[in-house]
């Protein structure tokens, strides 16, 4: 099986050049990075939740996450500036393509009642954001070892200038859009 990077260079670039009329292959949109983020508001009271989230995200991404801290104090949430409230990982190059392949072919089909992902979650500049309600759909996570089910944000950043270009790029990679 070819990797997504090889597929991009051999099939997707010529297809997008034809579809959008690009003259230069460097104009064709490409994946820039994939950012995985787990935000845990409950980590204010229970620091062990954050430790388990860091371990789970490291298993999912294949690299160590960075702990994110609160930028501002919010009294209503009993939150102080600098408190740890989540973790994130930025994937680039080979790990990015490996993660996308795993997401499309293994993880998303494991979602209960899966009929495709929404095609409306683009930001206006060709970047796509996907919310995953249960992180246990990833094959690396052992359901019995997990203390709680966490949500996960996946942001796919592309060099596309418009949502139409970004959606077509992800569709060519095999992203299962329902609309």
Curated annotation (Swiss-Prot):
Pfam family for this entry, one: Ribosomal_L5_C
Gene3D superfamilies hit by this protein: 3.30.1440.10
GO MF annotation list: rRNA binding; structural constituent of ribosome; tRNA binding
Keywords from the UniProt entry: Ribonucleoprotein, Ribosomal protein, RNA-binding, rRNA-binding, tRNA-binding
InterPro entries, per database record: Ribosomal_uL5 (IPR002132), Ribosomal_uL5_bac-type (IPR020930), Ribosomal_uL5_C (IPR031309), Ribosomal_uL5_CS (IPR020929), Ribosomal_uL5_dom_sf (IPR022803), Ribosomal_uL5_N (IPR031310)
GO cellular component entries: ribonucleoprotein complex; ribosome
Gene Ontology biological process: translation
Function, in words: This is one of the proteins that bind and probably mediate the attachment of the 5S RNA into the large ribosomal subunit, where it forms part of the central protuberance. In the 70S ribosome it contacts protein S13 of the 30S subunit (bridge B1b), connecting the 2 subunits; this bridge is implicated in subunit movement. Contacts the P site tRNA; the 5S rRNA and some of its associated proteins might help stabilize positioning of ribosome-bound tRNAs.
Alphabetical list of HAMAP family matching this protein: Ribosomal_uL5_B
Subunit structure: Part of the 50S ribosomal subunit; part of the 5S rRNA/L5/L18/L25 subcomplex. Contacts the 5S rRNA and the P site tRNA. Forms a bridge to the 30S subunit in the 70S ribosome.
Family per similarity comment: Belongs to the universal ribosomal protein uL5 family.
Official protein name in the record: Large ribosomal subunit protein uL5
Organism in which the protein naturally occurs: Desulforapulum autotrophicum (strain ATCC 43914 / DSM 3382 / VKM B-1955 / HRM2) (Desulfobacterium autotrophicum)
């Amino acid at each position: 099986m070819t990797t997504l990077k090889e597929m991009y260079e051999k099939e997707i670039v010529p297809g997008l050049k034809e579809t959008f009329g690009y003259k230069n292959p460097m104009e064709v949109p490409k994946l820039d990075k994939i950012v995985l983020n787990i935000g845990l508001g409950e980590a204010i009271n229970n620091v062990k939740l954050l430790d388990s989230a860091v371990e789970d995200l490291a298993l999912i991404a294949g690299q160590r996450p960075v702990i994110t801290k609160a930028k501002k104090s919010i009294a209503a949430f009993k939150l102080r500036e600098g408190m740890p409230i989540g973790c994130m990982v930025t994937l680039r190059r080979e790990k990015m393509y490996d993660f996308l392949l795993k997401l499309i072919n293994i993880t998303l089909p494991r979602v209960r009642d899966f009929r495709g992902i929404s095609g409306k979650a683009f930001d206006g500049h060709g970047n796509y954001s996907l919310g995953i309600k249960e992180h246990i759909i990833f094959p690396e996570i052992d359901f019995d070892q997990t203390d709680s089910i966490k949500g996960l944000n996946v942001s796919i950043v592309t060099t596309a200038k418009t949502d139409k270009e970004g959606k077509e790029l992800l569709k060519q990679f095999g992203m299962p859009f329902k609309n």
